[in-house]
Amino acid sequence: MKKRNLVLILVMMIILISSCSQATTDNATKGPITVATMIDSEGAILGNMLLLLMEDSGFEVENKIGFGTPDILRKALESNEVDLVVDYTGSGQYYGAVAAAAVWSDPQLGYEAVQTFDKETNNIEWLTPAPANNTEMLAVTKSFSEENDIRTMEDFAEYVTNGGEVKLICSASFSDNPMGLLGYQNAYGFQLTSDQMIVLSHGNTAEMLKALYDGSDGVNVSLVYGTDGSLQEMDMLVLKDSKNVPPVYLPAPVLRGEVAELYPELRDLFTDTFESLDLETLQSLNARVAFGGEDAKIVAEEYLKEKGLLD
């Protein structure tokens, strides 16, 4: 009788220990996952969305939003210094992915090219991107557009060819790029001279847009990125590029493969959020931070809750 009781006690203890162990496993903190972004309003907004969604799913997260420039961010990801970043599909051509120019100008083909390359070469996974092209484009003020009937790159080319007054402000990397200004000139048949341009060593479009807005040094055309937050607030018009000259840059979460294998739920955690972010939405969100001075985390949280993506 005593032996039977002893066996029963031992069985119950085993069950209890097993249950406690399972509970500990189920409640264990997942992570930590280090999230990093570039230094801009869009990086801050999208990075905070990633942080909020992961924390809501029980992940411990290390915040490195505003980590650095694109090259610094990429090196940190490749060296396992960070786990999850926000990057842009068109950048794949600079990371080593080889494809024809037409591939990078196609949203789906460009995504597939960098996705395949990084997975096979670096064990880095590109997750679902947002349908918002943050590529290099040219913008004018709406008043300039209306006065000169310029809404497209075809219109702009005709204006230049007919001797219209032009002062373009842009970055050196854009002015010398066959898929930037050189590509635009070849595709649309116009030519700008050096005295029609102000070329900066950096790509800070906030400074360029301010020059356009103020008309500094006669600037009436500026390099912009498609989702720049100041475009709506500053009453700017982006010239339509019907020939898709520059590469398409869709923002996407990019995750180290080892982390994706350890936590496979991360592959789908951000899908609904990024699919909801079209060009106008990102412009509006960026404007609240870059132009309105709102806190990026609050903007991100309000958006996620409004869309039913966060409790």
Predicted features, each with a name:
Residues 20-28:
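Bacterial lipoprotein signal-peptidase II cleavage site
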Residues 15-19:
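C-terminal motif of bacterial Sec signal peptides marking the signal peptidase cleavage site
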Residues 96-127, 191, 230-243:
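Ligand-binding "clamshell"
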Residues 69-101, 112-115, 206-211, 226-235:
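Pocket-flanking alpha-helical
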Residues 135-146, 249-263:
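A bilobed periplasmic-binding-protein/Venus flytrap-type ligand-binding module shared by bacterial periplasmic
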Residues 28-42, 50, 59-66, 164-170:
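Short, well-ordered beta-strand elements
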Residues 108-167, 275-279:
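A conserved helix-loop-strand patch within extracytoplasmic ligand-binding domains
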